[in-house]
Design a protein with these regions (language model features):
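Amphipathic alpha-helical dimerization/coiled-coil segments
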Residues: 87-109
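N-terminal helix-turn-helix
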Residues: 2, 9-77
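Extended interaction regions within the primary functional domain
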Residues: 1-5, 58, 102, 107-109
Length: 109
């Protein structure tokens, strides 16, 4: 990562940071969902910011309305799919490292 990005706050977007906070607040509420007003209170931001964040998350397939109550929102399966992909890739990398370690250990004998 670039040193400039590590040290320069000019690259930090308040809107992106708010949206990431919204994702964090929504996590764990997939069954019952959360209303925009609850979300605004917990994320400590305005209802307008929540409306904007939810619209962007929905557009990216990261959030969806609760099927049983369309006034409530939840995180969409796409985020779980991304997390599963990361987990799978890390597991594959770990297996490859274990295989490499075993192969190099055999060479030392």
């Amino acid at each position: 990562m670039s040193t400039a990005i590590n040290n320069d706050s000019q690259y930090i977007s308040e809107q992106v940071q708010r949206t990431l906070k919204v994702i964090s607040v929504m996590a764990g509420r997939e069954a019952q969902g959360i209303s925009p007003s609850e979300l605004a209170k917990l994320a400590q931001t305005s209802p307008a910011n929540i409306t904007r964040a939810l619209a962007n998350l929905k557009q990216a397939s990261f959030a969806e309305r609760l099927p049983s109550d369309t006034s409530r929102w939840r995180l969409a399966p796409k985020l779980v799919q991304i997390a599963n992909s990361v987990s799978l890739n890390l597991n594959q990398a770990q297996l490859q490292l274990q295989q490499d370690q075993q192969n190099y250990s055999l060479l030392a004998i």
